[in-house]
Amino acid sequence: EHAILHLLYSRFFARAMIATGHLPDSAAEPFAALFTQGMVTHETYRSTDGRWLTPEEVRLDADAPIEIATGASVETGPSIKMSKSKKNVVDPDAIIAQYGADTARFFMLSDSPPERDVEWTAAGVEGAWRFIQRVWRYLDEVPAAAPTAEDSPAALALRKATHKTIAGVTADIEGFTFNKAVARLRELSNALSDSLGVADAPGLAFARREALETLLQLMNPMAPHLTEEMWATLGHDIPLVETPWPDADMTLARDDVILLPVQVNGKKRAELEVARDADKAAIETLVLSAPDVQRYLDGRAPKKVIVVPGRIVNVVV
C-alpha cells in the first residue's frame, strides 16, 4: 500500500509536468510495473511480566531462551515483520560492525525470493559471511594462468560450470530472482573448490582462474566492496565496477545431454537423457527400448513415434 501511494503521487507529478511542458507526452505512465518486495521478519520475545524484549536482551540457551538481565524465562513468539512496538528489530550497525555491509546484503539477497518475507537469523548471516571468506581464500589458491591449446576433461567441466553460471546469474538478475543467482554462485564456488583437489591437467589452471574472476564479477552487484578489493588483489588496475559484464559462451554453457519427456498416447510416462545432437532415429531407438515405455507398449508395436528434437517424444499405440 505504501509503495502504491508513492507510485500514484509520482504519476500525478508526471501528468502535471507534462501539462507544464517539462516532460514529453510519452511520460504519462512513468512506471512499467510495480514489484512489491517482502518484509524482513524476526521472532518476538516477551518477558514473564508481559514486556517486549529486543533480541539483544535475550540469550538463546539450548533449553529455552532467557532474559539476560533477570535470568527469567522468555516467551518466544512467531517470526513476524520487524517493528519497534514489538522490539523484534536487529540493529544494522551492529551487524555491519561485526560482519560488514557486504555480508548483510548478501544474506538478504540469498535467503528467499525478493517478493517473499525473509526471516533474519544469526545462522543465515554467519553462513553468508563464511561463504565470502571462502571466496577470499581462493586468492591464495588460484594463481594466474594462460589458456592452453586443448582442455582436459576436468578443465572443460569447470569451464562449462563457469559459463552456465554466467548465463544463469544474468537471467536471474534480470528476472529479480536474486536468491537463485546466489545459489548459482555457491554452486560455482563448490565446483572451483572441487577442482582444487584434482591433479593438475591441461587447461585446468586457466579454468580455475577464469572461474574465480567470473565469480567476483557476478558477485559484484551483491558484495561490491569486498569483490573490488579481491579484484584489485588479483592485479587488475581497472575497477571491477567499470569492467564489462561477462558474456556466456553458449557452446560451453549448453548441456551436452538433455532430459527429454516421453509420452505414450499423450500422457507423460518417462524422462530420458539423450545427447543434445542425437538424430530422430537414435532418439526413437532409445525411447522404444526404455523399460518404462515397453511396459506401456505391452508387446505391441507402436503405430507412430513423433519425435520433436530437444522438446518431446510421443509414442502412439
Positions of predicted regions on the chain:
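Conserved phosphate-binding loops in nucleotide/dinucleotide-binding enzymes
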Residues: 44-101, 115-126, 251-254, 273-277
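A short, contiguous, amphipathic alpha-helix enriched in charged residues
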Residues: 277-297
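Phosphate-backbone binding interfaces of nucleic-acid-interacting proteins
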Residues: 297-317
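Short, conserved micro-motifs enriched in small and acidic residues
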Residues: 1-8, 206, 221
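Alpha-helical support elements that line or immediately flank enzyme active sites
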Residues: 7, 11-21
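Helix-rich, typically C-terminal accessory recognition domains appended to large enzymatic cores
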Residues: 22-30, 94-273, 306-312
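Active-site phosphate-binding and catalytic loops of NTP-dependent enzymes
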Residues: 18-25, 292-302
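Short, conserved secondary-structure transition motifs
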Residues: 36-46, 220
